[in-house]
Structure formats: C-alpha cells, structure tokens
C-alpha cells in the first residue's frame, strides 16, 4: 500500500513538472517591464505610460527566427532600425538598469503553418530605419508595424488589426517625451491615427500563449 502511494505521488509530481517550451520560427516575443519602472526621458517610458494596463507594461514586440540551434531576432528599434541579430544582442538591448531582465512573454499564431513565409517577409524589411513618427512611411517601421506588415495572408490581407493609437497617460495627459519628439519632427502627436502597439497585439485572438521557453530568462 505504501509503495502504491509513493508511486502515485511520483506520477502526480511528474505531471506537475512543466518542461520549458521550445521557441519556434514565427513566435512573437513581447517585452514587459514593471508598472513602476521608469527610464527618464526614454521612448520605453513613454510607450509604457501610454499602453499601461495591469501591473506589466508591454513596450516591445520581436519576431523569433530559429535556424537549427541558433536563435535570431528580427525587430525594429531606435538603436538598430529594422534588424536581424542574435538572441544575445536582443537580451543585451533589453537588460534593465539593475542588470535584470524584463519579462518575456512568448505567443504563437494559433494557425502557424505559414510561419516561415512571415519570417521570410520580415527578413526582407531589414535595413529599413525605425519609424519614430508612427505614421506610414516607405523607409521605416516601428516594432509592431514590422510584425503587422510581415504577417499577411496569401491574398495580402493582414492578420493583425489596427486601432486608434493612444500616446496619452492613463490620466489623460500627454507625456512630455511625445510632445517634444513630434515637435522636433515638425508634426503634431498622431493621437488617434490607426496603428498598432505591443499591448493590443499581444491580446489579439489569433495568438496563443506558449509559456516559458528554454532560451529566454524567466
């Protein structure tokens, strides 16, 4: 009887042990920082304030490009523009001020059969600049704009939707960063113009949560 109990306990423990998932080509990596995390005067701060929900601010979206044992990241950032680089570069770019990592949330299309085609299209955008003004531009893309333009069906239609962009803080005020940035660009803040953002994209119905993956810090 005792032996049977121990065996049953071991089976239950084994069932409760979750193995890290494997990152696949086409997976989307969402970068989340603590709600109270601030980087004075940075775009990350402005994005986190304007997309603030729950206790985690989703500030960036990147595309995984897995080739054998090598993991590459395709994303659009101020530092690199639209670029394909090793995972280590991505992790280094998003290391927080105290040396820790943000939270990485991995999601995958529920219908992922065309992932290679989406990633191939994303690779074709490398070399473009970073779209700082967040309005359509032939020579630059911002992070979720890159994803939306890359993930299109065979007929050219978009998988991810657009919504009116919100640059305001939860209290309705406009962060100074955005006001100053767009003034330098000689334009008004494009509040309400159709676009995408990491938080809204992460919550799209076409995606499913993958869980912790072995190659990303937890």
Which residue stretches match the model-derived regions?
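Positively charged n-region of N-terminal signal peptides that target proteins for export
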Residues: 1-4
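Sec-dependent N-terminal signal peptides
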Residues: 6-9
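C-terminal motif of bacterial Sec signal peptides marking the signal peptidase cleavage site
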Residues: 14-15
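Loop/turn positions that initiate beta-strands
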Residues: 26-29
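Glycine-rich catalytic cores of cysteine/serine-nucleophile enzymes that process amide/ester linkages
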Residues: 33-104, 130-138
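Active-site nucleophile-His-acid catalytic modules used for acyl/amide transfer and hydrolysis
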Residues: 46-47, 101-165
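Activation targets extended, charge/polar-rich intrinsically disordered C-terminal tails
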Residues: 135-218
């Amino acid at each position: 009887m005792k032996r049977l109990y121990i065996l049953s306990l071991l089976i239950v423990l084994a069932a409760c042990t979750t193995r890290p998932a494997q990152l696949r080509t086409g997976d989307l990596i969402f970068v989340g920082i603590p709600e109270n995390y601030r980087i004075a005067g940075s775009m990350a701060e402005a994005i986190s304030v304007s997309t603030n929900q729950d206790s985690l601010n989703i500030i960036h979206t990147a595309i995984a490009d897995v080739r054998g044992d090598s993991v590459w990241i395709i994303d659009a950032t101020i530092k690199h523009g639209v670029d394909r680089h090793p995972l280590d570069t991505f992790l280094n770019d998003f290391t927080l001020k105290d040396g820790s990592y943000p939270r990485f949330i991995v999601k995958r299309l529920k219908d992922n059969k065309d992932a290679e085609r989406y990633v191939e299209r994303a690779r074709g955008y490398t070399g473009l600049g970073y779209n700082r003004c967040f309005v359509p531009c032939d020579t630059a893309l911002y992070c979720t704009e890159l994803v939306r333009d890359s993930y299109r069906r065979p007929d050219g239609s978009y998988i991810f939707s657009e919504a009116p962009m919100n640059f305001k803080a939860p209290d309705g005020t406009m962060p100074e960063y955005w006001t100053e940035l767009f003034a330098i660009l000689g334009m008004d803040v494009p509040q309400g113009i159709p676009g995408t953002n990491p938080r809204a994209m992460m919550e799209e119905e076409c995606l499913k949560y993958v869980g912790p993956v072995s190659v990303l810090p937890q």
